[in-house]
């Protein structure tokens, strides 16, 4: 789909618009004023995208309208440029979502348009393309030989041609020669906006007024086709041909005779979601019903509320969601259900589809661009009332939101690690506040911050202490791997785990093994010189992958075929170390050759729909053992799984991050909770070289309250969230010394502003220091940590410093960003 814009700037109305412009820098980002040509007066609306001339060269760029206002004396009209085109028939963002974009700019230190692009499906974006064509009636004899060839080429096309096509066909590196021909009057150029994905349409046929005429001679096939089209009043050409057994030649003949006309009807690229009318109503336990009633009371209050649904693994939190949704779905308010991993989406969609059918839309990155665009349009048109998806689902374009549910709310995948660096929980709070809606945060292991707020009354608290039905929490054994090695066990599996795996295989029960490291071996070192094989672009060791016999970097994607030669000393003495999911899968296959083993990690699930196929296959009993990374630990419900094994706990505990204990406790509790969810009792084995560690003991007991009471004291003593916010200022550049200098210069600038403008502001500053992985993709990374209160004064201070620092040309090659409450510090 394309949009061609015309020059209509001479006839301007008395209307101006404030426009957020794409690809601006944070330093210079603002809402820019433009005049509205009179031809566009009835077309412009807040939330529509426009094409505008921008900068000294008047380069065409996309923007989105934030405000409309009459021409005012405050802005000299003669200095304003005019918009070139209106791209959208309808606004793509509501006033609420535009307000959200302003919120995101302030809180996440991004540009307006970065926030806007985050909310829109990629398929709806336009690409601005320059085209060149020949001017008629010019004498090309004065052109150079190369210019004449270009002129003849374009003349033969009889229409303007995209610049990329011309450059490719003539082997040109740039458009200099084309621009010279434009200036000389031989060529003209125009700009067109092409959308990345077109709407899906179906060719339809409908009868004209002549269809009832008896004076036109028809064949039997033509008569049968015309009768069917008249009977339906309009139907797809494909269906007409199918039911009458003809080809499109017959319909084309009717079209030429003037008896039918063709038109396109929009269709949606979505999978079938059929409601199961035979399903029994959702049955809740007494605890579940109490929680559901409490949540509904908050929903019905028509004020913004946040509630924490805290329930042990297997307590039936999903059933509470569905019952609550059944009670509110007919209130004409949007419902958003978020899950942290794509791997959880298929089970959720399957479960919810059986209850709610085509009222569901799905938002996540595994969908094609066309599918994502169509789901977005279904929601915007009011055809779907429930959106299920990952982090991006929080931006679903409902006119009014009534309920947002965040399952496994503690998961870090809800936090974006690229600009805008938002947390879906904060976006959900904004939307619920704007629409007086209810936000439900659900988890068996809530984030420390969320449970703290629930205990202190900022959130309401609903608790489920028992597993649903007859299921009980699994028995947990902590295996001491030191003792295993002393006893001569050289495998990565304790005797207790092997014994229970053997029992499950003999009794047709399923098992899950968690190892949160993909690849075969996690590092490769040289026996002679002791040097590890590292990525040339990053300060990190390469991981060996047996599937393709390559050593790969999990940061930048660099890979190299495996050879036995050490790149440092050139001896053939490389040895493998560490265990990844591929190696665990291989070793289990050797120990149990008859076992059907499925590996599930990002290497194995890279293709579209692979998650769903794997989960379905395991749920159907086609595999005995599931080996995977953290994506197998959360939210999945397999009643036949009675054994869970955690192969390596220790490296998670001792990560260089204040959240490592919380992450480890949550992951262990969640994966242990996958066992024994059906009628059979479950078992879990946690393997560790530090079996007496307090976090492991509490996770084995599934004792969140004990973990919380310990962790909250540490957080308070160390001034970590929720007692302070932690803002990470990141610096990245190709020159290490320049990047270090930039970090120190930023610190001086920040301290100077803070002392002069906010002398009473409580701040603690750490660094600058190297990032945990100092070099990634040939760029050196440094960080500055600021413990603060994330309020308007602090954000204003930081924004002013970032803008001032960004104007310093000395550090133009160093990128700087701010990340509030970053995942790792």
PLM feature segments, named:
Residues 1-427, 431-443, 455-471, 753, ...:
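Accessory, non-ATPase domains that flank or precede helicase/AAA+ motor cores in DNA-metabolism machines
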Residues 278-285, 289, 302-730, 735-740, ...:
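Inter-lobe coupling/hinge segments of SF2-like helicase ATPases
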Residues 598, 753-771, 812-821:
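Short beta-strand elements
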Residues 761-791, 798-801:
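C-terminal structured "cap/appendage" subdomains that terminate the fold
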Residues 737-752:
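Extracytoplasmic/periplasmic
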Residues 22, 37, 732-734, 787-789:
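Solvent-exposed residues in well-ordered beta-strands and their adjoining turns
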Residues 30-32, 236, 725-727, 780-782:
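Short amphipathic alpha-helical segments
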């Amino acid at each position: 789909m394309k949009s061609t814009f015309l020059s209509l700037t001479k006839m301007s109305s008395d209307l101006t618009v404030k426009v957020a412009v794409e690809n601006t820098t944070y330093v210079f980002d603002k809402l820019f004023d433009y005049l509205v040509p009179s031809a566009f007066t009835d077309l412009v609306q807040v939330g529509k995208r426009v094409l505008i001339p921008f900068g000294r060269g008047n380069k065409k760029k996309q923007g989105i309208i934030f405000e409309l206002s009459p021409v005012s004396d405050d802005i000299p009209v003669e200095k304003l440029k005019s918009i070139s085109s209106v791209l959208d028939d309808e606004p793509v963002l509501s006033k609420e979502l535009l307000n959200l974009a302003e919120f995101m700019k302030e809180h996440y230190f991004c540009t307006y348009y970065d926030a806007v692009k985050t909310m829109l499906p990629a398929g709806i974006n336009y690409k601005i393309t320059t085209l060149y064509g020949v001017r008629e009636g010019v004498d090309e004899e004065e052109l150079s030989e190369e210019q004449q060839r270009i002129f003849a080429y374009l003349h033969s096309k009889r229409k303007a041609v995209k610049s990329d096509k011309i450059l490719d066909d003539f082997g040109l590196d740039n458009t200099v020669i084309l621009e010279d021909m434009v200036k000389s009057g031989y060529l003209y150029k125009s700009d067109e906006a092409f959308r990345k994905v077109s709407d899906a349409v179906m060719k339809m046929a409908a009868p004209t007024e002549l269809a009832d005429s008896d004076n036109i001679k028809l064949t039997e096939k033509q008569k049968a086709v015309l009768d069917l089209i008249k009977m339906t009043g309009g139907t797809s050409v494909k269906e007409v041909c199918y039911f009458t057994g003809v080809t499109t030649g017959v319909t084309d003949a009717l079209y030429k005779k003037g008896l039918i006309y063709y038109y396109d009807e929009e269709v949606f690229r979505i999978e079938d979601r059929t409601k199961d009318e035979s399903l029994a109503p959702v049955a809740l336990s007494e605890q579940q019903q109490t929680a559901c009633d409490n949540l509904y009371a908050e929903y019905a209050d028509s004020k913004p509320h946040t509630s924490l649904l805290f329930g042990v693994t297997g307590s039936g939190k999903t059933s509470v969601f569905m019952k609550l949704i059944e009670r509110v779905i007919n209130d004409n308010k949007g419902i958003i259900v978020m899950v942290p991993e794509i791997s959880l989406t298929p089970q959720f969609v399957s479960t919810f589809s059986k209850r709610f059918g085509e009222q569901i839309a799905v938002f996540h990155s595994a969908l094609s661009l066309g599918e994502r665009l169509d789901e977005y349009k279904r929601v915007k048109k009011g055809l779907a009332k429930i959106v299920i998806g990952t982090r991006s689902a929080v931006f679903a374009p409902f006119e009014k939101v009534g309920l947002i549910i965040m399952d496994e709310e503690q998961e870090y995948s809800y936090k974006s690690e690229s600009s805008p660096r938002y947390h879906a929980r904060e976006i959900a709070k904004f939307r619920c506040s704007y629409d007086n809606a209810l936000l439900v945060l659900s988890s068996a292991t809530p984030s420390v911050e969320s449970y703290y707020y629930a205990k202190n009354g900022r959130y309401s608290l609903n608790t489920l202490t028992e597993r649903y039905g007859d299921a009980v929490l699994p028995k947990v054994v902590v295996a001491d791997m030191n003792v295993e090695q002393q006893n001569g066990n050289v495998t990565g599996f304790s005797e207790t785990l092997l014994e229970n795996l053997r029992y499950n295989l003999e009794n047709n029960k399923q098992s899950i093994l968690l190892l949160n490291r993909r690849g075969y071996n996690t590092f490769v070192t040289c026996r002679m010189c002791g040097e590890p094989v590292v990525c040339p672009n990053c300060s990190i060791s390469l991981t060996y992958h047996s599937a393709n016999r390559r050593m790969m970097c999990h940061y930048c994607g660099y890979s190299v075929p495996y050879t036995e030669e050490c790149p440092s000393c050139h001896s053939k003495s490389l040895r493998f170390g560490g265990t990844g999911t591929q190696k665990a899968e291989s070793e289990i296959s050797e120990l149990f050759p008859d076992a059907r083993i499925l590996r599930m990690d990002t290497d194995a699930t890279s293709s579209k729909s692979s998650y769903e196929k794997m989960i379905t296959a395991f749920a159907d009993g086609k595999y005995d053992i599931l080996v995977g990374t953290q994506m197998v630990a959360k939210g999945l419900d397999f009643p036949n799984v009675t054994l869970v094994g955690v192969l390596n706990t220790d490296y998670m505990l001792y990560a260089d991050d204040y959240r490592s204990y919380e992450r480890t406790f949550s992951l262990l509790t969640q994966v242990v909770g996958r066992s024994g969810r059906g009628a059979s009792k479950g078992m879990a084995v946690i393997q560790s070289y530090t079996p007496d560690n307090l976090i492991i003991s509490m996770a084995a007991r599934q004792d969140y309250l004990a973990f919380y009471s310990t962790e909250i004291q540490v957080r308070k003593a160390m001034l970590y969230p929720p007692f302070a916010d932690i803002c990470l200022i990141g610096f990245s550049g190709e020159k290490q010394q320049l990047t270090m200098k930039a970090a120190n210069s930023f610190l001086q600038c920040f301290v100077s502003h803070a002392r002069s403008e906010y002398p009473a502001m409580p701040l603690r500053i750490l660094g600058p220091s190297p990032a945990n992985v100092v070099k990634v993709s040939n760029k050196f990374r440094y960080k500055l940590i600021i413990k603060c209160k994330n309020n308007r004064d602090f954000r204003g201070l930081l924004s002013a410093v970032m803008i001032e620092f960004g104007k310093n040309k000395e550090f133009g090659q160093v990128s700087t960003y701010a990340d509030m409450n970053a995942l790792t510090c």
